[in-house]
Amino acid sequence: MLLIKRYLMDPESLRRQIMNVYKCYMWKRAFHSNRSLLEVKRREKSLQRKILERILRPKEENAVKKSGFKLWSSHLNNPHKTYMRLEELQRRIMEEVHVEGIKKNDKLFNEINQWHFQNENTSTVRTPTLLIHGYAASSMSFFRNYPGLSKHIRNLYSIDMPASGLSSVPSLEINTTTPLPLDIKFIGENKFKVPYTINANHNKFVIQMYEDFYLDRIEQWRIDNKLGKMNVVGHSFGGYLSFKYAVKYPNSVNKLCLVSPLGVERNIWSVNNNFHSNTLYTIDFKNPNSKFYSKRNMIPKYLFEQQFHILRMMGPLGAKLCWNYIMAAYSRVPSLAYKEYIFELFYGKGGIPEVTTDIFKALFSRCILAKDPLMDSLQYLNVKKLLIVYGQYDWMNKKAGMFMVKELNNLKNCLEGASYLEIPSSGHNLFLDNPESFNQSIVSFLSDETKSP
C-alpha cells in the first residue's frame, strides 16, 4: 500500500518505472529474436562454409582416422588401379546388401555398369524403376535403399552414369562452334549488367549437346534392356538430368521423382533471359523464381576449374583433407567400405574423369546455378506424376522446389499432379541419412496399386 501511495504522489516516478520494465522486456525480446535469427543463419550456412567445416573439423564419433601420407602414397598409380579398387569396394559394399528376389550386376555392352533387383513376389510397383545418382557418385549411392525399395518394386535398376563409377568413359564430341558465353559484370553489392547480348539459341543448342552425352545413353540403356515406360528417380545432378531426360524422351517416362535436384532455380546466368546490353539490373538474392536471382557466394574460379584435381596436387595434405570431408559428410553411414569407395572416386587417379567435370562446368555457373534452369522448361514436361523431395536440413534451395510444384500444378501438365515432400532428420543425401523414411515415401509415390477411397 505504501508503494502504491508513493507512486500516486509521484506519477513521474511511476512512468519511469514502467518505462524501465518495458525496456527490459523489449531487450529480452530482441535478444531471443536475434538468437533465433542467428540459429536460422547457422542452419543456412553456405555450401562452401559447410565443406570447409567438414574438412577442418570432422566429427570425432565413429570417425576412422587415416594417415594422409599413407593415403597419398598408396594412390600414386594409374586409372586402371583406381578402377580395380572401385570394383573390389563395390563387391564389398554389395555383399552386405540382402534383398528379396534376384540381385544381378552387369556391364551392359561393356559400357553401362548396372544393378538389377528383381522381385516377382511384389505387385506394389510393377513399372520398372531406374535410380540415377548425382555428380561425382555412382550406383553405390543407393546401397542402403536397395533392400527396402526392391521389397516393393518388381524390377528396380540402378546404373553408374557414363564416365562414372565402373561405367566406360565415352569421348565428348561437341560438333559446333563455341558460342559467345554470357558475361556478367557485377557492380557494387547488388547490381549487374551484361556488356553484350548472346545468341541464346546457339548457347542452348550447345548446352543440349552436353546434356545429350548422358540423356541419349540413358535412352539407349532403356532400349537395350527392352523396357517400356519407366519410373525415374534422380538425385541432385541426376535429378537435373532426369528432368531433362523426361523432357527429351516423354514417351519413356511414367512417374518422375526429383531428389534434392540441382539446377531448379531461375537465375541471372540462364541463357534464356535475353538481358539488354549495358543495362543496370538489380540482383534478387531471395526469390529463386526470379530471373534476377543469384547467390551471394561464388566458388573461386580456380577451384571450380580444377575441382578434385586440386586434392591430388596437394599431396598428403589433400588426401587427408579429402578423407576428413568424407568422414564428416557421411558420418551417418556405418559402412567403412562405402567411405573408402567415395574416397577412391574423389581422390583416385581417374576416379572422376575429366569429361565429367567438363560437362558440369559447361552446364553450371560458379554459383552452382544452371545455365538452362529446370524452371525455364516446365511447360515442356509431360509425365504422369511428379514428386520433388528434399532433406529436412538440405542445403539445396527448397523454396525453388515449392515454386516448381506450384507452377507445374498451375500448368496441369502432370496428369496426376506434382507434390512436394521433406524427409525428416536428413540432409542433401537424404536416402543415406534416413533410408527407411526415404524408401517409404518413394514406394508410396511410385505405387501402382489402386488406393481405396
UniProtKB/Swiss-Prot annotation:
Primary localization class, coarse: mitochondrion
Keywords: Acyltransferase, Cell wall biogenesis/degradation, Mitochondrion, Transferase
Boundaries of every AB hydrolase-1 domain copy: 130-435
Sequence motif HXXXXD motif, location on chain: 428-433
Record carries keyword Cell wall biogenesis/degradation: yes
GO MF term list: carboxylic ester hydrolase activity; lysophosphatidic acid acyltransferase activity; phospholipase A2 activity
Cellular component aspect of the GO annotation: mitochondrial inner membrane; mitochondrion
Localization: Mitochondrion
Protein's GO biological process: cardiolipin acyl-chain remodeling; cell wall organization; lipid homeostasis; phosphatidic acid biosynthetic process
EC number: 2.3.1.-
Keyword set includes Transferase: yes
Gene3D superfamilies referenced in this protein's UniProt entry, alphabetically: alpha/beta hydrolase
Classification via Pfam families: Abhydrolase_1 (PF00561)
Enzyme class: transferase
Role: May be involved in cell wall organization and biogenesis.
Leftover remarks: Present with 143 molecules/cell in log phase SD medium.
Comment on protein domains: The HXXXXD motif is essential for acyltransferase activity.
Family, per entry: Belongs to the peptidase S33 family. ABHD4/ABHD5 subfamily.
Protein name (record): Protein ECM18
Gene label: ECM18
